[in-house]
Amino acid sequence: MEKKKILIIPLCAVLIALVAAVSVMLKRNSISKHSLIYADVNDNKLISYKISEKAEIRISFDGYSEYLLVGKYIGGEYCCVSKGENSLYDVLLIKNGNIEKTYQLSFCPDEIAATDDGIYCLTNGKIYRLSTADNTETLYKDNVYTHKYRLNMLITDKGDLVYLREENDGSVSLVLDCDGQETDVFTFNPDDTIDVGLNTDNRFLYKDKSGNYKTMAVSVYGGKQQKYGKSATFVQASSDGKLAVKCKRQVLGECSDVYIVDGKTGIAVSTHLVDLDIPYSVVVV
């Protein structure tokens, strides 16, 4: 009887390890089915980088040749800003690989994000809201902090706006805007804090200089600050809220590879892209 117990214990350990390995493999395969969408800043082309194939594919839509910027689109796959044949700036909402709707802007923003109700455009410290009902532009926020930050305006998977507000005393507040109702998430000294984006689970990630640049996380919908536990150069949640993009510096060659990461399990798949190859405005689909 004792011999049987001795044999069963190692067998159970092997089975547990096998199940864990299979689970990780399945998650990696699931992550690999996704693609990165971004605009090539060198020739203004729209690029889809397929993780499974480690290859770039150019995307084009009839009537458009220059693609300047991409952003998150709640309700579809992504949005992008393009210069049309009439030399105006068009916002294309992409769903299922096709243009769902088109809107016109009088300027090219620095950052863009879209919902079914409105399109948010950040430029020169101001956020403009483009109505999806009548295509009108209105000034929405005029005190946005942008200095030394890569991501200053974000959209949660619920379609709510998150942005950085500059305060009179020089501090900066992370603000959640739900249909015009603002809630201050937390306030920080911009000289000591570097933001890295909005992760899955609607957690805002940032690096604190006073804490040896450890990555911290705080939920924009309430909750205490906590250590994120993993290094990140920037983070952008995917349109389905399941995956995130992050950069991770490798020891060999001092090269920053871009990883697709499951935000809930930490499983990562390398894209073999370096972070300098893609801009901060990248969307996972």
List the model feature ranges, each with a label.
Residues 93-96, 100, 114-118, 129-131, ...:
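Flexible "stalk/tail and boundary" regions
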Residues 64-75, 106-116, 146-157, 190-200, ...:
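Repeated scaffold domains used in trafficking and secretory/extracellular systems
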Residues 206-261, 266, 272-273, 277:
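Intrinsically disordered, low-complexity segments enriched in Gly and acidic/Ser/Thr residues
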Residues 42-48, 86-92, 125-129, 169-175, ...:
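Structural motif
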Residues 22-62:
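An edge-strand/N-cap motif at the start of beta-rich repeat modules
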Residues 1-15:
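N-terminal Sec-pathway targeting helices
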